From Swiss-Prot:
Protein's recorded name: SCO2-like protein RBE_0029
Taxonomic source organism: Rickettsia bellii (strain RML369-C)
Similarity comment: family membership: Belongs to the SCO1/2 family.
Any Pfam family hit: SCO1-SenC
């Protein structure tokens, strides 16, 4: 009986994974991204998949949100900062993808984790996400907290710099969306690619 339940669970995960991957690929293909610049990782990392991701941060309401809150549903996680136009556009595209998934009766939790916790406090995240999608969960914490969770996901990012030409701060980082299973384990990651006007 237990073996049968495990097999059914794996089948459901496989189907959901295939549907989500297909929808994300098609959405990016027909949106403002060049098809040749869209990268879909087709391999699930055995190392990452062998153990659940562990972290503890604070959401936009100031409440603790940890790895246990990822369990019970699929999650899409994106790392970025509130002052980046590229990140804002990425979140809006994720929002569009979620709407498509909802039409297929696939419920996915969306999580935005800041890479600049000094600037992006819970209050800043709350105001920022209200203008994008109230369903997004925004997470922040101490510098050590963010470093730890970024390392868990192997996120590449550089220290914040000031752009004298634009008069704005920028923080360069990898542009991946991470899909987490309903038991809190890494399943897959997708790169959103580069917009046509950024080539």
């Amino acid at each position: 009986m237990k073996k049968h339940k495990n097999q059914m669970y794996l089948i459901k995960i496989f189907i959901a994974l295939a549907v989500i991957t297909g929808i994300i690929y098609l959405y990016l293909f027909y949106s403002s991204f060049e098809p040749s610049q869209i990268y879909i990782n087709t391999k699930v990392s055995d190392k990452n998949n062998s153990q659940a991701i562990k972290f503890a941060l604070k959401d936009q309401k100031g409440k603790v949100f940890n790895d246990k809150d990822l369990k019970g549903h699929l999650s899409l996680i994106y790392f970025g900062v509130t002052y980046s136009l590229d990140d804002e556009n990425a979140l809006k595209k994720i929002e569009d993808i979620i709407k498509i998934l909802q039409k297929e009766n696939i419920v996915v939790q969306t999580v935005f984790i800041t890479l600049d916790p000094i600037n992006d406090t819970s209050e800043v995240l709350k105001k920022y996400l209200e203008n994008i999608d109230n369903n997004f969960i925004g997470l922040t914490g101490t510098i050590d907290d963010i470093t730890q969770v970024a390392n868990e996901f192997k996120v590449f990012y550089e220290p914040k710099t000031f752009d004298t030409e634009t008069g704005k701060y920028e923080l360069k980082h990898s542009n991946f969306v991470y899909l987490i299973s309903s038991d809190g384990k890494f399943l897959k990651h997708y790169c959103l690619g580069l917009p046509k006007n950024d080539r």
